[in-house]
């Protein structure tokens, strides 16, 4: 009797061992795959990283940071719908993360909605970005907010954001790229001002000048808002750009623990 019991226990242990070993081996392999995905991600090989992340996301409960990484990968693949979906899901769980890292996720979510022309959804994420991003990046964010409000025909808000952007860009006005952006802002702000005063003549906006270059504001030709919007819309198919490097938000010691 005792011999039969020992035999049954031995068989049971063997069955359990045979069952657990493949699971442990698979989990170890998947941890290696996650490490590989992080390497691809840090090297800006977003397509390769996304393929691995997608597989692991179907198998494991990836944490919010990894879901945010997936959102960034989708963004760089021009899949703005999935980028926004993953980032919106992940962002509420990232409150304890470093401020600038969070600003990257907010900005990417905003850009995803912007590129889908869902400007009302983009605005709050741009506004959250402003409170956390570097000073050097704030001009770009205000410029984007100006675009959102202009496309939504909220002329005063658009004008105000363009003025904020102009003020912030003045610190870097010697840079050639910034000079072009400043000239563009002057034209768009003037057009928004004209549109606003056409519908609210009793509330004239006081134009503030920051002397981008001597006489710019006096000689700039006003373009119709429809022409400006048409021109801007045609440029929205350009390759997406995020103003910080991915390596700034990913740690080389990123944990690769997986949970079922």
What feature does the model see in each segment?
Residues 69, 108, 144, 178-181, ...:
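Canonical tetratricopeptide repeat
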Residues 92, 150, 155-173, 183, ...:
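TPR/TPR-like (Sel1-like) alpha-helical repeat modules
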């Amino acid at each position: 009797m005792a011999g039969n019991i020992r035999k049954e226990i031995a068989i049971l242990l063997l069955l359990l061992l045979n069952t657990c070993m493949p699971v442990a081996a698979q989990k170890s392999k998947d941890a290696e795959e996650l490490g590989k995905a992080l390497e691809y991600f840090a090297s800006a090989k977003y397509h390769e990283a996304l393929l691995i992340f997608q597989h692991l996301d179907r198998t494991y409960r990836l944490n919010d940071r990894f879901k945010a990484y997936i959102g960034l990968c989708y963004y760089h693949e021009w899949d703005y719908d999935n980028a926004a979906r993953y980032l919106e899901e992940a962002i509420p769980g990232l409150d304890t993360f470093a401020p600038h890292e969070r600003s990257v996720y907010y900005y990417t979510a905003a850009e995803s909605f912007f590129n889908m022309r869902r400007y009302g959804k983009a605005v709050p994420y741009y506004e959250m970005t402003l409170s956390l991003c570097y000073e050097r990046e704030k001009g770009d964010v205000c410029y984007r907010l100006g675009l959102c409000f202009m496309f939504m025909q909220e002329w005063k808000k658009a004008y105000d954001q363009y003025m904020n952007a102009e003020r912030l860009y003045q610190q870097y006005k010697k840079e050639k790229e910034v000079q072009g952006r400043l000239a563009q802002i002057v034209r768009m702000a003037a057009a928004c001002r004209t549109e606003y005063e056409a519908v609210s003549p009793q509330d004239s906006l006081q134009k503030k000048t920051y002397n981008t270059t001597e006489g710019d504001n006096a000689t700039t030709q006003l373009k119709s808002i429809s022409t400006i919007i048409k021109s801007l819309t045609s440029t929205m198919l350009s390759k997406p750009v995020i103003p910080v490097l991915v390596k700034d938000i990913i740690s080389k010691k990123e944990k690769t623990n997986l949970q079922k």
